[in-house]
Amino acid sequence: MIKLSIVIPTLKEEGYIEGTVRQFERLSISHEIIVSDGGSDDKTVEIARTLTEKVTVLSDGKPTPSKQRNAGAALATGEFLCFTDSSVRIPDIEKFFERAFAKFDADHELVAITGPQNIFPEIETFWDRLFLGIQNSLIRFQNNVLGRGVGTGKFMLMHRNAFLQIDGFDVGLIAGEDLDLYRRLAFVGKTRYMPDQAILYPGRREHGLGWPKLLWIWTTNVIWIWIFGHTWIKEWKPVR
C-alpha cells in the first residue's frame, strides 16, 4: 500500500500548481499526488496532467473545497491523506513528513495533525505575524489542551480510515469545512497541533481582502456554522 496520498484542490492555479506538485519530488516516502480541480478555465488542469496521472475535474458548475477534497480522496489509495492548498510550500519536505509519521507511530490514538501556517517570509507583514500567531496559538490550544479538533485546509494530515469513518468533508459547507472535519475527527481519536510541522503560503486572501475584512468573514462563518449548521457566506470566491 502507498503510504501517503496528497490531495490538492485547484481553481485557476496555473501560476502555482507546478511548483506545489514538484516539491513532492524530494519526498522519498511512497506517495501519490491527486489534483482535484474545480473547473479552471486557465492552464491549471493541462499543467497538472503533465505532473500526475490522478487529476479529477468537477463539472457540476458549483465547485467548493469540500467537494474537491472529497473527489480527490475518492481516488486515494494511501494509508494517510494529506490535504494541502495549491500554493503551499513545505520547508525541508523529507524531514517534515518523517517527523509527522514518527508522531503517528508513537501514539496509536492519534488520527490527525496540523501545524503552524505562516506567510512567505519575503512578503510577510507585521499584521500577518500578529494575526497568524494568534490563530496558530488558538488552534494549538483547542487541539492540544481542550481536545477539540481544529484544522485549516492549508495542511491537514490524517489516517485515511479515520477520514472514511466520518464520511469525509461536509459538502453542504461552502467554507469552514476544514474546521468541521477536525471537529468530527476528534470524536474518533486524537487531533493535535504540532509546532514543528509549519507550512508557508502566499497569503493572497489576507493581503487581497485585508485582515479586518477577513477576520470578520472568518468569525461570522464560524458562529453561523456553530448556531445554524451552515456558513454565512453563499460563495467562497478565489483570490488570485
Language model feature labels by segment:
Residues D37-V45, V88:
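A conserved acidic beta->alpha catalytic loop
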Residues D60-A76:
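Glycine-rich, basic loop-to-helix element that forms the pyrophosphate-binding segment
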Residues I119-F126, I139-M158:
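A recurrent flexible, glycine/aromatic-enriched loop bordering the glycosyltransferase active site
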Residues D92-F126:
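Conserved donor NDP-sugar-binding/catalytic core segment of glycosyltransferases
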Residues A175-L181:
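Acidic donor-binding loop at a coil-to-helix junction in glycosyltransferase catalytic cores
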Residues L81:
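Short aromatic/hydrophobic "clamp" motif used to bind/position activated sugar donors
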Residues K12-R26:
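Short, well-formed alpha-helical segments that are part of the catalytic scaffolds
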Residues S30-G39, L58:
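Short beta-strand/loop segment that forms part of the nucleotide-sugar
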